[in-house]
Amino acid sequence: MEDLIEASHLPGVVLIELDGILTTQMSDVNDVHGIPMIWEDTGYTGEGSVVSIIDTGIDSNHVGLDDMDDDNSTNDSKVIAFYDAVNNPDKTNGTEIKAYDDQGHGTHCAGITAGTGAPDFVNIGVAPQAQLVGVKVLDEGGSGSFATVMAGMEWTVDKRHDFNIRAASMSLGGFGLIEWTSSEEESVNRMANEMVRSGVALFIAAGNSAISAQIGTPGSAEDVITVGALDKDTSIAVYSSQGPTEEGRVKPNIAFVGSSVMAPEANSGDGYVAYSGTSMATPGAAGLAALMYQANPDLSPFDIRNIMQETSTYRQCHYLLANEPCPEDLIPKNRQNNVYGHGHVEGLPALLEAANYVYGLNTDINLSVDSDLSEENRINLHPGESFAVSVQGSPMEVQWRTWDMRDNWMSHPNFLEGETNFEISHTMLVDRLQYLPGNQIEGNQTVIR
């Protein structure tokens, strides 16, 4: 009260009044990204998909997260497994502990991904018929050690087949927000990439440091889908962290509504609360992945990311709220920028593109690297060098791409049908990488098998 009286005496102050709080219902979030059109036009609601929420836990007693059909007489749990890396790290089978949340952040995220919206069905999650796996890596204060975060990520990879985990949401980390050593940060990023390569589409929050900080661990990991936050009008939220990463990598990948989002309030029974942050944007994007996996279970995590990126609506970045566009905006084929990534996510186009992905796999075709590999399965190419690959099975063509996930698959220029070998040269790698904006390539190149 004393502060208000003091403020009232400041020069120029005529009136002081309460500032009302505006909230965004989940129905509004879903509308922005076209989610209801998916439900209505295709019937996909996430059934059969499982998303891991790696966070503070999940309150599985909340009416929006306790079961699939909001009928207490049926035995159809929404949360099918739970691992507590903080307080019960030795209980690893996933069914020994009932899911809980002593902080609330994870429950909120879980509801955005797959909440049923009970009891009033206003704040329905993006994939309301998807199921969840809770992985508690943050304590009651919302903090997480290197050991617990790594344990939760490793557990998710180990149990991905047991519980059919296809996607994961991690709303944690950020530049300078978790006190890890550089070695620990590298390990977490490496584990994040390993999760993706093992078959889990991993969505990570960009962070809430706005324009003042880079995107840090684990959102800086190369293979993950880093998510920035939008306001309801699809403009970038003022708090949403912007790239590049410390390594110079362009991030985020995509942007999703994250401001003042209503979702389940932990330990309230049936209450809902509004939070803001890239933490709220990330589980929304993970929910869309659950819908896409229902439409096409054969998708890889890289397919999920590429489809979301390619179908997003590009937004000019306008660094520092300047009136002129930033360099990426001037490229004829708009590319990822450090504010919006590839743009704001468009749900229905992404879903339809996912449903149309068709795979024809011939297991008789094999590729093998003939050049010598290091102990880490790497080849270090110097300028002028190449590495050789043998082909078995008579493919019609060979396609390749660089390690940069913004790159596109392309046919090998010198491979003809019926040939049994081909080479990838240092020049080919450098030419492709330099084509992508933001890359400065020189010297040797390393190829990971």
Map each language-model feature to its residues.
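Hydrolase catalytic cores
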Residues: 110-113, 133-139, 168, 214, ...
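Surface-exposed, flexible coil segments in extracellular/virion-facing regions
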Residues: 406-431
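Short proline/glycine-enriched turn/loop motifs at strand-loop junctions of beta-rich domains
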Residues: 258, 392-398
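Secreted peptidase-domain scaffold signal
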Residues: 182, 207, 336-338, 344-371, ...
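Extracellular S/T/G-rich loop segment that most often corresponds to the catalytic His/Ser-adjacent loop
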Residues: 76-88, 216-294, 298, 302, ...
